[in-house]
Amino acid sequence: MIFVTMLLNACALKTYENLSPPTKEPSLNNNYFITSDGTHLPIRKWKSSEPIPKAIILAVHGFNDYSKFINVAAVFFSRNNITTYAYDQRGFGAAPNRGFWAGVKTLTADLLSLTLLIRARHPKTPLYLLGESMGGAVIMVALKDAHEQARDLGLRGVILSAPAVWGRQFMPWYQTTALWVTAHTFPRAKLTGRSLKIKASDNIEMLRALNKDP
């Protein structure tokens, strides 16, 4: 059994894409957040209704999602003089290496770098981080490990929406085993959930919009 598992692992496609060695200073333009290893991560911005926003929100999406997840809320925030930023994390949305897991250290390093760039762009405006599901987990881990940078980040607060807090260490062995085998044997498999015959929401307009979103 062990031998067969090793063979399967050897034949499986790569599932990880870690942070490369730093080659440049992180930067931010209208379309991309460019990381320290030169990776271009797409970024969206919803400007506040007034020239000077009363607050800034950096939104971090969840697993199998991307930066547009915050669109409805960001439009509301904009009308209330709040500017919102959101970016596609590595492996998600239009970011490079879609489908590959970048690793916790890489995702948190990206978040901290982008937070510092936004803080530098808006030095006197209250800055908040907003994370949904996996995005909430990325924020929590990043801030836990960022004691030395905490003052430079200058955060006014954190907003967590259904943060992902159930890690593998709390899962029974059969779940972690199934996840590992599936990820290393069928890394490109797509799970749609269609066979479950469950309606995700009674908001038909929202479901249609999601269906049309590439």
Per-region residue spans from a language model:
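Conserved alpha/beta-hydrolase
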Residues: 74-98
